[in-house]
From Swiss-Prot:
Protein task: Potential odorant receptor.
Organism: Mus musculus
Record's protein name: Olfactory receptor 5H17
Chain's gene name: Or5h17
Family named by the database record: Belongs to the G-protein coupled receptor 1 family.
Any one Pfam family match given in the protein's UniProt record, by short name: 7tm_4
Length: 309
């Protein structure tokens, strides 16, 4: 029999990272510092790239957009998490929750496409250096960037549309520190099987496509590098590609586990830790990963610092 007089929740309660009061001040300070570093690092990288004409090439245009998306992703998740740790942001309306997830879905998916586009750019630059200016034109670069953001937007629209069919009448407690689709499905009183299928098909397809693009691109890059006889050329290629591969590995690992592994009705703390990794930790690491081993970025930073002194 169907339930009668069901109360549909209009607000959710985010449990946050921890329920232990003694840990909240320390966690707040730690993640506040991480968020500050994320904003400074990524916006600083964007400013550096756009102020240096020598960096106005596709490789750094992709990198500046990656920094923008990392800032977007972190700003979607971290402020709410910080308020939650202060016991001031636990309650969130259904509309706010869906808006946060929509913003989160756009940024996460866009980053997947950007990482794939960056891998193709490195393939073109290293495997076809003489033809690179012809292959990776400014027009193609802008198109790849536009497709990345459009793909992220459309993917978010699909999930948001299927999320709107759900009702929440049993529990309004979300065992997470932000509104993600999986925790929402776990508390839905509507059968979420279709939503899980949509996640598996669309999220899985996007991740498989982008990961395969990265792997195929870097397989060709690796063979090309091994054929090089110049030690300097090998070091430069490995330095550039190594940073990208590290970023890709750190980003895709948690995502694959979160959205492609079989769904479970149980609340898993491991899922929350993995989410923390790619929503908070990766955005602060990317500027470091891409900058410290990049001579052009370091040189540009030195020039900017000299001008400021």
């Amino acid at each position: 029999m169907e339930k009668k007089n069901e109360t549909l929740w209009t607000e959710f309660v985010l449990t946050g990272l921890t329920c232990l009061p003694q840990w909240k001040p320390l966690l707040f300070l730690v993640f506040l510092v991480i968020y500050f570093m994320t904003i400074v690092g990524n916006l600083g990288l964007i400013t550096l790239i756009w102020n240096d004409p020598h960096l106005h090439i596709p490789m750094y245009l992709f990198l500046s957009n990656l920094a923008f998306v990392d800032t977007w992703l972190s700003s979607t998740v971290t402020p709410r998490m910080l308020f939650n740790l202060l016991d001031k942001g636990k309650v969130i309306s259904v509309a706010e929750c869906k808006t946060q997830f929509f913003s989160f879905a756009i940024s996460v998916t866009t980053e997947c496409f950007l990482l794939a586009a960056m891998a193709y750019d490195r393939y073109a630059a290293i495997c076809n250096p003489l033809l690179y200016p012809v292959i990776m034109t400014n027009r193609l670069c802008v198109r790849l960037l536009a497709l990345s953001f459009i793909g992220g937007f459309l993917h978010a629209v699909i999930h948001e549309s299927f999320l709107s069919r759900l009702t929440f009448c049993n529990s309004n407690i979300i065992y997470h520190f932000y509104c993600d689709v999986i925790p929402l499905l776990k508390i839905s009183c509507t059968d979420p099987s279709l939503n899980y299928l949509i996640i598996f098909i669309f999220s899985g397809s996007i991740q498989v496509f982008t990961i395969m693009t990265v792997l195929i691109s870097y397989t060709f890059v690796l063979f090309t590098i091994l054929k090089k006889k110049s030690d300097k050329g090998i070091r430069k290629a490995f330095s550039t590609c190594g940073a990208h591969l590290l970023s890709v590995s750190l980003y895709y690992g948690p995502l694959l586990f979160m959205y492609v592994h079989p769904a479970s009705s149980e609340v898993d703390d491991q899922d929350m830790i993995l989410s923390l990794f790619y929503t908070v930790i990766i955005p602060v690491l990317n500027p470091i990963i891409y900058s410290l081993r990049n001579k052009q970025v370091i040189d540009s930073l030195k020039k900017m610092l000299k001008m400021m002194v």
